[in-house]
Design a protein with these regions (language model features):
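Positively charged n-region of N-terminal signal peptides that target proteins for export
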Residues: 1-4
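Terminal presequence/propeptide segments associated with secretion/organelle targeting
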Residues: 8, 15-655
């Protein structure tokens, strides 16, 4: 009975939060939330947003392997997303002779479209509540003393419904509200995906790392794919005789634009948030995880950047790796900045004081804090290990292939690398590993290596690259750290207490009817807000929109991040007033990249592609006055397609 009451209250409280805060489950929009959205400016009924019986806006929104979001924009399968979401695909398709990252790619005919390996596009067909079944299975596992790994529970439920929906798609079960609700989603998955259009990085990522997470920005961050099916319309692997997909629903593109205060809505697949985390969890991120990750990634970027500036072939090989390092590094630094500036730890402690009053004599919060203190040392050791030997180089696949004797795969992996770069990365990683990780965890090979060469990293490096890369990367094992942590935790894990804490937060909020929505978990969500300005600091007020004139103002021929191709610069000089990017206060996070930004009528006005630095506490703490979503204006996309790429046939198809 307690669980039934809890589930009912969860649904009630899902509509109590502030209008602009929250990533709402697309399938649970009720009349109260609908009314709030209409009060904010929405001109559609909830059924037009999500409806399993007839076409709705959600049918036009897709997940790109649950890493990004895209939108269907033509009846012949065109799908638009961010360029940075397509970056890895464009990188994989590029060669020194055809560098599509630097030069861009424009398929003027369908037979010029490039097949993309490994991409998967997910269309949500149905989502339904399976809470009772999951809970019953959990109780059964508990009663029989079976290992209760949730993935095992999910698989059993997914297998059951796979028989019900045989041949209709893929099923994924997900947890909501910290394991108090479970939903099953049915997806149709398409894997024949082809690249159609992508501007050069000098347009798509104008401003580079300098402008990343900043405002104002001037990025043409978009790319267009086409989805293909078998001739009968069913999903299929790539084949030359496949035909363009005919989607159930496409988004209408409008060129009317928006003004400050206009309603905006984002539908997408936000990845992960942790907004009900304890102060101790935030403190661990702030003091242990983020400083190490930010510094190590910065140092690795410097190593790669040095080589990329010396060799164009290395720049092409390592562009994707550098992009990934840079993005995470800036996020980690930004989180540190925001946690400190907005006093997130103290704010969480205030919440804990309120919870303690509600709990009464419970010692849960004390025990949680003590447990975090107990495991802080070993958790720091794990981060150092992961950031050096696990993530510090790109050699794992190559080394594993050699170890297995698979010389063909090893050769393929070697083609992706430059050993001069990897040697420098390994030098840095080994040095940091031996400096920070205690010898008890080194393992046999690294212990012997260090002893033989007296800690001389360069001497050790020579032996490692003389046939011992696999030994160096696998000598230290995560199991050693985990065993030590288990010993410290003594049967009561930090994670189990953190879950117990979140459950208590949920119960308190439900009892007090306080705002609450489920954390993001890579399932379809809706967030609504408005176009707005940003006042990030005292005496600084920033407008909500940028124009092409700003691209020219930032142009610097001597700075790779701000350079422009001569023909594009000439075009900009003729058109200084084209809208480029705009700001909203929609609540987004990683995974929302590429999400459609819709107006009050559900028309496509832009694509979400970034957030501002001041919003980077958002995964754990929402700062309403500072949270912003940075969007590329669809009018800039259309202008680039028309005046720069001259893709008239494509424009006819989508307009």
């Amino acid at each position: 009975m307690k669980r039934i009451v809890l589930a009912t209250a969860l649904l009630f409280c899902a509509v109590c939060a502030f209008a602009d805060e929250g990533m709402w489950m697309i399938n649970t929009i009720d009349r109260v939330l609908e009314k709030r959205m209409k009060s904010a400016g929405l001109k559609l009924d909830a059924k037009m947003l999500y409806d399993e019986e007839q076409e709705s806006l959600s049918d036009a929104v897709v997940a790109l392997a649950f890493g990004c979001t895209g939108s269907m924009i033509s009846n012949d399968g065109l799908m638009i997303t961010n360029h940075h979401c397509a970056y890895s695909d464009i990188h994989a398709l590029s060669t020194l002779g055809h560098n599509y990252l630097e030069d861009g790619f424009w398929a003027m005919r369908r037979d010029e479209e490039l097949p993309v390996k490994g991409q998967a596009i997910y269309f949500l067909k149905k989502i339904f509540d399976v809470t009772d079944e999951v809970m019953a299975l959990r109780q059964e596992f508990d009663a029989e003393h079976k290992p209760m790994a949730m993935r095992r529970v999910y698989k059993q439920i997914e297998d059951k419904y796979a028989q019900v929906y045989e041949g209709q798609g893929e099923l994924i079960c997900s947890s909501y509200y910290n394991g108090n609700k479970y939903y099953m989603a049915l997806y149709q998955v398409y894997r024949d995906v082809r690249l159609v259009a992508a501007p050069p990085v000098s347009i798509a990522s104008f401003g580079g790392d300098t402008d990343n997470w900043e405002w104002p920005q001037h990025k043409g961050d978009f790319a267009i794919y086409r989805i293909y099916t078998a001739p009968d319309g069913s999903p299929a692997e790539y084949a030359p005789d496949n035909v363009p997909m005919h989607p159930k629903k496409i988004l209408k593109i409008t060129q009317d634009g928006l003004k400050d205060g206009d309603f905006t809505m984002v539908i997408g697949y936000p990845g992960r948030t942790n907004r009900y985390a304890s102060s101790y969890a935030v403190e661990e991120i702030l003091q242990i995880q983020n400083p190490i990750q930010a510094q190590f990634r910065l140092d690795q970027m410097k190593i790669i950047d040095k080589w990329m500036n010396e060799d164009v072939a290395i720049r092409l090989k390592y562009a994707d790796r550098y992009f990934s390092l840079s993005n995470v590094q800036e996020i980690r630094e930004g989180e540190i900045y925001c946690y400190n500036r907005f006093g997130v730890v103290d704010a969480k402690r205030t919440e804990e004081q309120q919870l303690q009053k509600w709990l009464g004599n419970s010692d849960l919060i004390y025990r949680l804090g003590q447990k975090y203190e107990d495991v802080a040392g070993i958790n720091q050791q794990i981060v150092y290990f992961q950031e050096t030997l696990v993530r510090g180089t790109n050699l794992h696949r190559y080394a594993n292939a050699l170890f297995r004797g698979d010389t063909v795969l090893a050769a393929k992996e070697l083609e992706k690398l430059d050993m001069r770069v990897e040697r420098d990365l390994m030098r840095y990683s080994l040095g940091q590993f031996f400096k920070h990780v205690r010898p008890v965890y080194w393992g046999e090979y690294l212990t012997g290596l260090n002893q033989r060469f007296g800690g001389d990293v360069d001497a050790m490096l020579n032996e490692v690259f003389d046939g011992h890369i696999h030994d160096a990367l696998t000598s230290c094992k995560i199991v050693a750290f985990n065993e030590k942590r288990d010993e410290i935790e003594a049967g009561v894990s930090k994670n189990s207490l953190e879950k117990e804490y979140k459950d208590a937060v949920y119960r308190m909020k439900l009892a007090k009817k306080q705002p609450m929505y489920p954390d993001a978990n890579s399932t379809m969500r809706l967030t609504y807000g408005k176009v707005c300005t940003l006042d990030p600091r005292d005496a600084v007020s920033l407008a909500s929109r940028t124009r092409t004139a700003g691209v020219l103002e930032k142009y610097n021929a001597d700075d790779y991040e701000f350079t422009l191709k001569p023909d594009f610069r000439e075009l900009l000089l003729q058109h200084p007033d084209i809208p480029v990017n705009f700001l909203t206060d929609n609540d987004i996070t990683g995974g929302n990249s590429g999400s459609p930004v819709l107006n009050a009528k559900g028309e496509l006005v832009g694509l979400a592609f970034d957030g501002n630095k001041e919003s980077l506490a958002g995964d754990t703490y929402f700062v309403e006055s500072m949270n912003r979503c940075i969007c590329v204006d669809i009018r800039y996309v259309l202008w680039l397609l028309r005046d720069y790429a001259h893709m008239d046939e494509l424009l006819t198809e989508i307009l």
